[in-house]
Amino acid sequence: LLIITACLALIGTVWAKEGYLVDKNTGCKYECLKLGDNDYCLRECKQQYGKGAGGYCYAFACWCTHLYEQAIVWPLPNKRCSGK
């Protein structure tokens, strides 16, 4: 039973949701300039998704990691970022 519980916890950690941080009003990704480790992205991901979230700059947009399964990430259905 202990081994099964440990395996389930590991699978949940490995398969945690990831995605681009999105502005729910505009449908646009949060932009960033400094690729890789980025304090701005980390702070914004934690603020929107909680203390357990991580974040960095990938392809000039904030990429959030360790999200809960229901977290809303880019792209939003039926909402396109105007002009981008």
From Swiss-Prot:
It is found in: Secreted. This is Beta-mammal toxin Cn2. Belongs to the long (4 C-C) scorpion toxin superfamily. Sodium channel inhibitor family. Beta subfamily. Expressed by the venom gland. Gene3D superfamilies: Knottin, scorpion toxin-like (3.30.30.10). The keyword Cell inner membrane does not apply. One of its GO terms (cellular component) is extracellular region. Mammal beta-toxins bind voltage-independently at site-4 of sodium channels (Nav) and shift the activation voltage to more negative potentials. This toxin is active against mammals. Pfam families: Toxin_3 (PF00537). GO terms for molecular function: sodium channel inhibitor activity; toxin activity. Has the structural arrangement of an alpha-helix connected to antiparallel beta-sheets by disulfide bonds (CS-alpha/beta). Keywords: Amidation, Disulfide bond, Ion channel impairing toxin, Neurotoxin, Secreted, Signal, Toxin, Voltage-gated sodium channel impairing toxin. One of its GO terms (biological process) is defense response. The modification Serine amide is found at S82.
